[in-house]
Curated annotation (Swiss-Prot):
Name of the protein: Recombination protein RecR
GO MF assignments: DNA binding; zinc ion binding
Matching Pfam families: RecR_C (PF21175), RecR_HhH (PF21176), RecR_ZnF (PF02132), Toprim_4 (PF13662)
Organism from which the protein derives: Pseudomonas syringae pv. tomato (strain ATCC BAA-871 / DC3000)
Keyword Lyase: no
Lineage start: Bacteria, Pseudomonadati, Pseudomonadota, Gammaproteobacteria, Pseudomonadales
């Protein structure tokens, strides 16, 4: 089926979203045009406002509309802990754990094959933040449990070690409520390597 230039442009615009292929983009575009024009207008308005009004926090680099995000402007948070994550969505995930320290958001993970070195993901800015705020006593490396995430955590841990700072890594393993026969071998191996004695 051949689409008009404006419909084709809308379909192509939807395809920039992660996980949205040609068919899904077509369905989205046609749904808005055929059945929900007011929803499409609200989407366009909200998208325009967000693109113009949302930037990065001056300290942690998460997404925010202010100079400082709510976590960085909260004076009650623990200034001795810094949690390093790969992206803004990770901040929201860690917040659900009850963590009350500070954050630093990288722009992804090290991936030399994709041309992403330390500068591209913000490691120099991380080290500058740590140098400027001398209250940090522990840096929690909460990068993803992928090969790239592990490499990123190891690289940062080495830099921190050279500065005499404590680096810790979040534990990986069997999810709460998970069944062992459904867990992949790599995850189970991490669980065994990170086992702890039972406190009685």
């Amino acid at each position: 089926m051949s689409f008009s230039p404006l419909i084709r442009q809308l379909i192509d615009a939807f395809r920039v979203l992660p996980g949205v292929g040609q068919k899904t983009a077509q369905r989205m575009a046609l749904q808005l045009l055929e059945r929900d024009r007011s929803g499409g207008s609200r989407l366009a308005l909200a998208l325009g406002q967000a693109m113009d009004g949302v930037g990065h926090c001056r300290l942690c680099r998460t997404l925010t509309e202010e100079e400082l995000c709510p976590q960085c402007s909260d004076l009650r948070r623990n200034d001795t802990l810094l949690c390093v994550v790969e992206g803004p969505t990770d901040v929201y995930a860690v917040e659900q754990t009850g963590y009350r320290g500070r954050y630093f958001v990288l722009k992804g993970h090290l991936s030399p094959l994709d041309g992403l070195g330390p500068e591209a993901i913000g490691i120099p800015q991380l080290m500058e933040r740590i140098s400027q705020q001398a209250t940090f006593t522990e840096v929690i490396l909460a990068t993803n449990p992928t090969v790239e995430g592990e490499a990123t955590a190891h690289y940062i841990a080495q830099l921190l070690h050279d500065k005499g700072l404590v680096a810790s890594r979040i534990a990986h393993g069997v999810p709460l409520g998970g069944e062992l026969d459904l867990v992949d071998g790599g995850t189970l191996a991490h669980s065994f390597a990170g086992r702890k004695p039972i406190a009685l």
